[in-house]
Structures are given as structure tokens and as C-alpha cells.
């Protein structure tokens, strides 16, 4: 049963975190007649620009969150970012609020330690060897045990912040400091992972819905400093590797529970599949599905959350996405070259509407469909490269 927005019968969805992914979720929810409320720590965030109303609050602050949730009384609370008081979400769920997909899933996946221990120690999924450290002394010992090269990440961060690879002993102190600087919330610990010489990495978008579990065609992606730069779909895989990735994705998403879309990341080495991470919500690499699939990851998430059916997920065309990044720190920006980007065959452009910029901030994405993935990747890079993010004088 779906009510009428802005009436007593309204079905209300509250987004906690209002970036570009939250914006698309809000748009899809509104297509189903859902009343939407956007919450983030800064004003004019992308999802706030399309929601029915919005609130600015520090979502790590329990009291601030409680005030807004009591005021709005949402039917669905949908976390989109890591910097949320997830312990309070567990309390809210016990009080009868519905957290998407579940409060436990949100709590575990906001913290790399929680999800890694669940995957590797409880579910026996293959992962890179790992250690955790709270002090520089523990960190140095962990690096020695894991060996070089190794990958360093804060246990809580977003968009690749604080991630680096230690290749030589000279990198150790820099990596520790960088990880601490990139941490979000209370996540002061870091994870030290053995470097896997993988052939490629994928995101397997996995949907838990009223009719079971479904998978999108695998998405390949390229990262720099842990932050996504481009993605493409489908990623060619052997049948054996794909079947194993789907098996592991089902195991981890069943353990987390609830309904919704999960972005499950894997390293692939031949036919061997290593679990990396999981996000219980749409994934940045999955933005390519806005061009390639009959239902985007955002529509799939909203359908699953609302208990609506999800028939066959179809790949309509090979395609790719490529990010548009800011170069400077500015209070207001404008975009030039959009018309040139849209002249690239098969291209679409999404500008996120972020209120300000900083170096490397993701401000938009170019989406391209083409007869094959290689062509789509080249054209997406070309389209994104034509867009310039410029300060408003």
C-alpha cells in the first residue's frame, strides 16, 4: 500500500546522506509516489534539491537524529553514507522503525572491521589476509606480519579517503598518517590487507527482494587511490568465476538480511574470487546502470524496499561511466563543455549539483552506451573530458 505524498496517508522515506546516489534514490522513490525527506550534515546537498523537504544535522549526533526522526516519523529510513550513528539505528529498529536493509547490516558495513570479520571469520569467505591496528606500534607490527606490498584503509571512510598501498618501508609512516586523516566518525582503527595481484575487480549488484535474490551483470571498474574513476558493464568473466561471485554475494547478503540492493565487491584472479567489501545500498560504480539496464540500481533498490516485484534484470546495451572531477576548491562552480560532451555518440551527462567543490570531488558523471565495452569506455572518457568545472567569479 502506497499513500499520497504530503497527505496523512503518505508513505515516507528518509534519506540519511544526500549525495549523488541518494539523489537518484529520492527521484526513483518519488516516481512511486513516496514522500521523501533528505538529511545531511550540509545544506543544499544533491538529494535535498529533489526531496520534498530536508534537514541539516550531524548524523553522528544521536540527539540531533532523534529530534528529526521523531518530528518526521518516517516509514523507511535509508542510510546512504558511513558517517551515521549506527548504534542509534539499532535502537530505532527495536522501537519499530524500519531501517534499510536492516540496522545490523548498516552497523556492520559502515565499519570495515565488522564486515571483514563477518565475511572471513563467520562465513568463511575467501579474502585477503588482514590485520587491524589502533596504534602506530600495532600498525608497524601488522605490516611486518602481512608483508609488502600491503593495502592500508581506515576502518571507516568513504570514496577511497585514507587508502594507500605500502610498497616500501619508507611508505609505512605516511600510510598510517594518511589513513588516520581520512577516517570518518569514530573509526580510528585501520585495516592492513595483503595485496592480491588480481586480474580485475568487479561490483556485483545483488538485490534481495520479495521474489528472492537477483544479480545484475557484473560491473568492471577502475579506481585511483581507492576512489572510483570509471566503470563498465558487462565485465567479461568465466562462468566459473561468475558463479562463485554470485554464491559469495548470496552468502554475505543473506547474512546481512533485509530487502534492497547491495553492492558487493570482489577481486578476481583467474577463476578464484576474493570477497572485498559490501555496501547495503546503491554503489557508485553502479551508476552505469542508468544507461545500460532496463532498471537502474536505484529503481531496483526502491522496488525491493517497497516490496514491489522485480522481473528479469536485462542488459539493454554494453556501456560505461566516467567521473567528472573538480580541480579546485571553490564555493560555487559552473560547468562548460556539456554540449560537447553530449555530442559524443551514445552519451548522457549527470551533473550532481553539489554546492561547492574541492580538488578531486566528484561533481558529475558521463554515461555512454555503445556496441561494445571498449568503445563505451573510450567514449565515456572522451565525454567526461570535455566537461570543465570552473569557479564562478
From Swiss-Prot:
Protein residues bound to N(1)-(5-phospho-beta-D-ribosyl)glycinamide: 20-21, 80, 284, 354, 361-362
Involved pathway(s): Purine metabolism; IMP biosynthesis via de novo pathway; N(2)-formyl-N(1)-(5-phospho-D-ribosyl)glycinamide from N(1)-(5-phospho-D-ribosyl)glycinamide (formate route): step 1/1
Ribosomal protein recorded as keyword: no
Annotated ranges, domain ATP-grasp: 117-306
Amino acids binding ATP: 112, 153, 158-163, 193-196, 201
Subunit structure: Homodimer.
Functional summary from the UniProt entry: Involved in the de novo purine biosynthesis. Catalyzes the transfer of formate to 5-phospho-ribosyl-glycinamide (GAR), producing 5-phospho-ribosyl-N-formylglycinamide (FGAR). Formate is provided by PurU via hydrolysis of 10-formyl-tetrahydrofolate.
The name this protein goes by in its record: Formate-dependent phosphoribosylglycinamide formyltransferase
Originating organism: Syntrophotalea carbinolica (strain DSM 2380 / NBRC 103641 / GraBd1)
Organism placement in taxonomy: Bacteria, Pseudomonadati, Thermodesulfobacteriota, Desulfuromonadia, Desulfuromonadales
